[in-house]
Amino acid sequence: MELSLSFPVSWLCALFTAIALYCIAVAFYRLFLHPLAKFPGPFLWKISIWPTVWQCAHGKRHLDLLAAHKRHGPVVRIGPNMLSYNTGSAARTIYASRHANVRKSDFHLTVDASVSAPSLFSIVDREKHAFRRRVVSQAFTEKAMMDASEFYLKYMKVFLDVLHDKVGTGWTKVDIQEHATWWTSDTMGDLSLGRSFNCLTEPTFRHAIPMMRNGLRYIYWAGHLPFRDLVDYILAHPILSRYGGQSAVDNRNYFDFCETAIQERIKEEQDALAAGADEESRRKDYIHYLLAAVDPETGEKLTKNELESDASLLLAAGGDAMSNAIAGIMFYLARHDFARDRATAEIRHQFASAEDIRQGPGLAACTYLEACILESMRMAPPVATSPLERVTVGNGIEVDGHWFPAGITLGVCFYALNFNETIHKDPYRFRPERWLSSEEGITAEDVQQSKSNFFPFSAGHRHCPARNLASRNLKVFIANMLWHFDLRPATSLGVNESSGEEGQTGLFCIEDALISIADGPVLEFKARLGYNASSS
């Protein structure tokens, strides 16, 4: 009996000893022999990927990386095989050059693991990405963007009617992020899927918004797990919808919803073509342009699965990213009287009627409003916060004086870059003037330094293809809000008044979940004296 008991015990002891020795050996290698051993960073981050998984799961990775850069400098080792930079030169080297020896990391494969084809965002292969980029960019020509802007304006009018009805003539509390999300969801649903969610006027599909966000949260941390290949397999397996938890279920349901809507829209477009409908009579949405798009180099078109993936991407990125940008801008305008009053005066002086607020010379002349938008997006970036990971390939790459062989993961923490004191003076202070060389004490060189080191939609040939469309309609939205309403902070901004990093107060609180996710702010609005929805 003693022999039979001691036998498994001894084997268990041997097994645990072997595991312990293996872990010690791996830690020793990563600390002292790894190609990144000389770079500073928190101890646990150097030896394990699990701190990254934890940060992603809790939505605070951008704050942890900001603190790490403040402590360790412009380059920080944030994983056993990963570095983060907070310099503009690194961003230009890693992201902007078409010839840089880097590719997207395998994390991106997890983003679309549960669908039939990768989207433009998640394609790792550079040649395949170039093909997709050439095709998808045809949905963002000047003509296509003008057509898309009509969708934004259509739902802008609905939004204003809803807000006027809610606000009336007295000061009324409004969760601006919630209402902006309804606007972007309705707009992007109609534009990307051919189906408006009608969130502004009825609650039926409002559940789809947290469903999409939960899916993003799940992908963000699951894609960084050390057994990512297994995660990708599970994401694509039906068993996930039963045992994967609510976030996993929401991720699957979101893609199923998009797939059904897109298939119906494709059939509608094909039926119109078969019936001989002329070009002018057909809907000019994303599906219309993507179905017609042909790669000028190969003559190929998107497959049905590729079209579904890219339309779903446009819905997610174009909807939540814009609503979070709106939330951040309104937060900072409400908190800073000097900026709000000046931007409001500029808009109301420029436009006698709200009907005139659209893309054109009049809106382009509102330079202070543009500066407020840029400054808000610097302090609360709606898209790029934590590093967009790139893996070195071929003969390696030199970044800020350091040479890296193939197989190293690099990235720029854009949130830390935006608060880099060597680039943006007094970075925790809301200063729209930093973007205007006409302001006293601001030189053209100061403005150029800020603009050349600012990447709200990433950089280079892999930046967001919809960035120009988003920027234009973001400005239209904010201009309409300032024309129609007076605003001020609510008595309490609640969870949206962040303590920031290292005691910095008054920062808008965002969650890092692949893109930024915001909650609120709750602000007080009052209809502009003498104006209402009908008079606009």
Swiss-Prot record:
Enzyme Commission code(s) on record: 1.-.-.-
UniProt keyword Membrane, yes or no: yes
Keywords associated with the record: Heme, Iron, Membrane, Metal-binding, Monooxygenase, Oxidoreductase, Transmembrane, Transmembrane helix
Gene3D superfamilies: Cytochrome P450
Cofactor(s) required, per the database record: heme
Molecular function in Gene Ontology: heme binding; iron ion binding; monooxygenase activity; oxidoreductase activity, acting on paired donors, with incorporation or reduction of molecular oxygen
Subcellular compartments: Membrane
GO cellular component terms listed in the entry, alphabetical order: membrane
Main subcellular location: membrane
Pathway in which this enzyme or protein is active: Secondary metabolite biosynthesis
Its membrane topology: Single-pass membrane protein
Residues passing through the membrane, by range: 9-29
InterPro entries in UniProt: Cyt_P450 (IPR001128), Cyt_P450_CS (IPR017972), Cyt_P450_E_grp-IV (IPR002403), Cyt_P450_sf (IPR036396), Cytochrome_P450_monoxygenase (IPR050121)
Protein residues bound to heme: 464
CDD domains the UniProt entry points to: CYP67-like (cd11061)
Function: Cytochrome P450 monooxygenase; part of the fragmented gene cluster that mediates the biosynthesis of fusarochromene, a tryptophan-derived metabolite closely related to a group of mycotoxins including fusarochromanone. Within the pathway, fscF catalyzes the epoxidation of desacetylfusarochromene which opens the way to the production of fusarochromanones. The first step of the pathway is the epimerization of L-tryptophan to D-tryptophan in the presence of the NRPS-like tryptophan epimerase fscC.
Protein family per UniProt: Belongs to the cytochrome P450 family.
Entry protein name: Cytochrome P450 monooxygenase fscF
The organism of origin for this protein: Fusarium equiseti (Fusarium scirpi)
